[in-house]
């Protein structure tokens, strides 16, 4: 717990400390509703959740950008669907990126750490993953973005594996043609060789529709909203988890940026499916 607090606290301090003239980024929060269905046990549950997130970026040299980000999320799914009373606890994720300008496009690398603890020390799941990413301008009003990463977990003493020895891909499209609104649609796919148990592969997918709309004169304060559908399958296990989410919140962009400018500068986040999938491992046990 002390290590967790130190890591997350350090990330948030760096983000808050970045709110100066030579940097840009955002801070925000959202609330939402998660509906989950365990097909194997025929359990259903819905729970509210809250998220706090932030990112800070700075230019490096003539063509580089460094981004640091942090996310903290908590939901209230009951132990009867999570399995064996292992209720979910606060989850968090931190990431770092370096992107390089190539004309109107950006190519880069990223590294991230996810932590999804539950009640009981034998059901805490952590993973490190990293890979390559890119943002490609297709027209003046549209862009596509993509990430491909490898991830691994070493959850000593856990009864299950989490996200062990796996790959994740993320592909999205953004529409920037509105004066004050950014819209994104994206898909995430992942497969790993140790999910619920060591010999059981994980087949994971998530689809999201996301938006941000400016509500003040310079679009620095935005309303955020989104919906997502995810499915988490462990081979050889009758349990399959389906999760649907809807959320609404706000973000404040600092450093003279806005949703669209921040996106074009490289603030695209990291894949969320690894953190989400580890949250449901005890349910598949």
Per-range role (PLM):
Residues 104, 123-196, 202-210:
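Detector for outer-membrane/organellar transmembrane beta-barrel domains
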Residues 220, 235, 245-285:
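Flexible, glycine-rich linker and terminal segments associated
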Residues 24-26, 60-68, 102-109, 140-146, ...:
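Repeated loop/turn-to-beta-strand initiation elements of outer-membrane beta-barrel proteins
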Residues 1-21:
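Gram-negative bacterial Sec-dependent N-terminal signal peptides
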Residues 44-52, 88-94, 124-130, 161-169, ...:
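Residues that define the transmembrane beta-barrel architecture of outer-membrane proteins
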Residues 31-41, 70-78, 100-104, 111-119, ...:
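Transmembrane beta-strands of outer-membrane beta-barrel pores
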């Amino acid at each position: 717990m002390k290590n967790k607090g130190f890591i997350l606290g350090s990330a948030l301090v760096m983000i808050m400390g970045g709110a100066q003239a030579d940097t840009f980024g955002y801070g925000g929060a959202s609330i939402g509703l998660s509906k989950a269905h365990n097909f194997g046990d025929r359990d259903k549950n819905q729970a509210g959740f809250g998220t706090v997130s932030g990112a800070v970026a700075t230019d490096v040299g003539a063509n580089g950008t460094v981004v640091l980000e942090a996310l903290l999320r908590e939901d209230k799914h009951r132990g009867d669907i999570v399995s064996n009373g292992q209720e979910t606890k606060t989850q968090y994720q931190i990431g770092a990126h370096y992107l390089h300008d190539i004309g109107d496009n950006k190519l880069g690398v990223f590294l991230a750490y996810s932590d999804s603890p539950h009640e009981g020390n034998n059901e805490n799941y952590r993973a490190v993953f990293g890979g390559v990413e890119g943002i490609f301008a297709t027209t003046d009003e549209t862009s596509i973005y993509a990430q491909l990463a490898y991830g691994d977990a070493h959850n000593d003493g856990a009864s299950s594996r989490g996200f062990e020895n796996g790959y994740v891909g993320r592909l999205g499209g953004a529409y920037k043609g509105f004066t004050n609104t950014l819209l994104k649609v994206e898909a995430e796919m992942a497969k790993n060789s140790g999910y619920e148990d060591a010999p059981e592969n994980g087949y994971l997918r998530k689809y999201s529709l996301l938006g941000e709309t400016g509500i003040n004169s310079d679009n620095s304060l935005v309303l955020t909203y989104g919906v997502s559908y995810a499915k988490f399958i462990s081979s050889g296990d009758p349990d399959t988890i389906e999760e649907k989410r809807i959320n609404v919140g706000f973000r404040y962009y600092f450093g003279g940026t806005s949703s669209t400018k921040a996106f074009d500068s490289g603030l695209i986040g990291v894949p969320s499916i690894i953190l989400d999938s580890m949250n449901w491992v005890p349910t598949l046990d």
